[in-house]
């Protein structure tokens, strides 16, 4: 059988589900319904985070840890007490990042949670890049940091899947991930931990390979970027 992440020559599609670990029921739904090729991203604020990571890995999933970063509308939109701030000194950025990275073990990389203001901070992203490189941790960009730095392993999302929470909108976004894969050999989509998103992704994942694509974990895309 083909190992996860092994290229078979087909266009690669990868999906990340973010925001897991905060709601136990939704997190269990993800673990029970999604195939192992789907990458699961957990909030660092999750209770029982390590247990969730262990359960995800036991089911064959790759795991990412979310790093909350300052959005444009902060503090009205506040991703939590360890948010990486755009105007923070590099030492403070690294201190917060180290707290996040120390919350669990067994993840291959991190992904930004929000952060459209922080990623434009050269000093902030440089500090993040250095800390991740020292640990050998990948940086996956949710799509807003494509012009900024990251870790040594890197992939950038092509398509948010559930900006509009309706089955037709999510299905259309998944088709755009496929289109990106046809155009450049790989496509990466990101959905959040909503029951509807999980159902639509599970349904799509069950038949996407029959249409000529390879469903791959996010790290497989990061390695060839």
Q: Model-found features: residue ranges?
A:
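Catalytic domains of cell-wall/extracellular-matrix polysaccharide-remodeling enzymes
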Residues: 87-171, 192-209, 213
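A short, acidic, amphipathic alpha-helical segment used as a generic capping/interface helix at domain edges
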Residues: 169-183
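Hydrophobic faces of well-ordered beta-strands that scaffold small-molecule active sites
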Residues: 13-17, 36-42, 61-67, 110-112, ...
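A charged helix-plus-loop insertion that forms the helical arch/lid used to bind
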Residues: 77-89
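Short, surface-exposed connector motifs at secondary-structure boundaries
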Residues: 9-11, 31-39, 106-109, 130-136, ...
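Active-site beta->alpha N-cap acidic-glycine motif
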Residues: 1-78
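Glycine-rich, charge-decorated loop segments at or immediately adjacent to ligand/cofactor-binding or catalytic sites
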Residues: 52-54, 75-76, 147-153, 224-225
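Solvent-exposed loop/turn segments at secondary-structure junctions
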Residues: 19-22, 45-48, 69-73, 115-119, ...
């Amino acid at each position: 059988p083909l190992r996860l992440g092994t290229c078979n020559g087909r266009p690669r599609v990868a999906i990340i589900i973010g925001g897991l670990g905060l709601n136990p029921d939704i997190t269990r739904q993800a673990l029970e319904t999604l195939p192992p090729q789907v990458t699961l991203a957990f909030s660092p604020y999750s209770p029982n985070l390590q247990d969730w990571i262990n359960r995800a890995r036991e089911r064959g999933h790759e795991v990412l840890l979310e790093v909350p970063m300052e959005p444009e509308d902060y503090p009205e939109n506040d991703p939590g007490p360890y948010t990486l701030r755009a105007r923070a000194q590099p030492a403070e950025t690294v201190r917060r990042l180290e707290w996040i990275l120390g919350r669990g073990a067994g993840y291959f990389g991190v992904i930004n949670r929000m952060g459209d203001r922080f990623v434009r901070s050269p000093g902030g992203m440089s500090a993040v890049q250095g800390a991740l490189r020292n640990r050998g941790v990948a940086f996956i960009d949710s799509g807003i940091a494509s012009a900024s730095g990251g870790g040594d392993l890197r992939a950038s999302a092509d398509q948010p899947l559930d900006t509009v929470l309706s089955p037709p909108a999510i299905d259309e976004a998944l088709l755009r991930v496929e289109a990106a894969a046809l155009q450049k050999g790989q496509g990466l989509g990101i959905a959040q931990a909503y029951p509807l998103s999980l159902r639509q992704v599970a349904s799509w994942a069950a038949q996407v390979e029959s249409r000529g694509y390879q469903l791959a974990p996010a790290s497989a895309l990061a390695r060839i970027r």
